[in-house]
A protein has these predicted regions:
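Hydrophobic faces of well-ordered beta-strands that scaffold small-molecule active sites
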Residues: 16-20, 41-43, 72-76, 94-96
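Structural motif
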Residues: 12, 36, 88-90
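Active-site-adjacent beta->alpha loops and helix N-cap segments on the catalytic face
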Residues: 1-13, 24-31, 48-64, 79-84, ...
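Conserved, mostly hydrophobic/aromatic
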Residues: 41, 86, 97, 113
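Alpha-helical membrane segments in multi-pass integral membrane proteins
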Residues: 38, 43, 56-64, 71-75
């Protein structure tokens, strides 16, 4: 269970990130995970939802509004041209995958994302 994983991670001085891809009731589940002691709660917009035009912004805002202790990570659909609006919401961790890996110039895409995160 997630609770057992959190306990085991903390017992070994490690942190645990829980990915909430495909979770329907984000606020409810985020509160539960926060109470369980998850170190990071990740909002993650999958490819299918990205294809429908969804971004992780709304999910990020919802989760940040209900948690008290956990940090927030965000993933899914983040690219150099969208990362600034994500960073403006001040997540604790930004995960960029396809936005770099699938870019015409992955090195430049990574640099642009890093610059946005560092406020450059």
């Amino acid at each position: 269970s997630i609770k057992a994983a959190v306990e085991e991670a903390h017992k070994n001085d490690k942190q645990l990130l829980v990915d909430m891809i495909a979770v329907q009731d984000l606020e409810k589940r985020a509160k539960e995970l926060d109470e369980m002691g998850a170190d990071y709660i990740a909002v993650h917009t999958g490819y299918d939802l990205q294809a429908e035009g969804q971004s992780p912004l709304d999910s990020l805002r919802k989760v940040k509004s209900v948690i008290k202790n956990s940090k927030v990570a965000v993933a899914g659909g983040i690219k150099p041209d969208t990362i600034k609006e994500i960073v403006a919401e001040e997540p604790d961790l930004v995960i960029v995958g396809g936005g770099i890996a699938n870019a015409d110039d992955p090195v430049e895409a990574a640099k642009q994302c890093r610059d946005a995160i560092e406020g450059k």
